[in-house]
Design a protein with these regions (language model features):
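N-terminal capping segments
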Residues: 1-57, 68, 75-77, 81
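Short, surface-exposed secondary-structure edge patches
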Residues: 60-66
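Aromatic- and glycine-rich peptidoglycan recognition patches
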Residues: 76-118
Length: 118
């Protein structure tokens, strides 16, 4: 898949940022999410993971189990936190080394799946 590139929209073909990719997928299928907030990228760039986690927790609510187009946060190596989105019964992520890849549910079994609150 596309390489990891901070702040890139996957539609441009140069790379993908996990947060922007999740928003793009949710847009394409008509699933609710809040408007994109550049502050999330600024916090990630500054490695302010606790603040980013707090925004995530405030904007989302847990779902009882993994469901199509639910989202999750995960540890992403040197890049701190990453966002994954459930697509076709697996999780699409942007790995800091491997780029965009689809993972089977067992690879993300420790994740808490959430959806954006309206």
């Amino acid at each position: 898949g596309l390489p990891h590139r901070f702040g890139e929209h996957p539609g441009n073909g140069r790379g993908a940022d996990c947060l922007i990719m999740a928003w793009a997928i949710l847009d394409s299928v008509g699933v609710y999410h809040p408007p994109f907030d550049e502050r999330w990228l600024e916090l990630a760039r500054a490695a302010k993971w606790e603040e980013l986690q707090a925004l995530w927790d405030a904007a989302t609510e847990p779902v009882p189990r993994m469901e199509e187009f639910s989202v999750c946060l995960f540890e992403n190596g040197a890049n701190g936190l990453g966002v994954g989105i459930v697509v076709e019964n697996g999780v699409l992520v942007v790995h800091h080394k491997r780029g965009v890849c689809w993972l089977p549910p067992r690879a993300m079994r420790e994740s808490e799946y959430r959806r954006f609150v309206q």
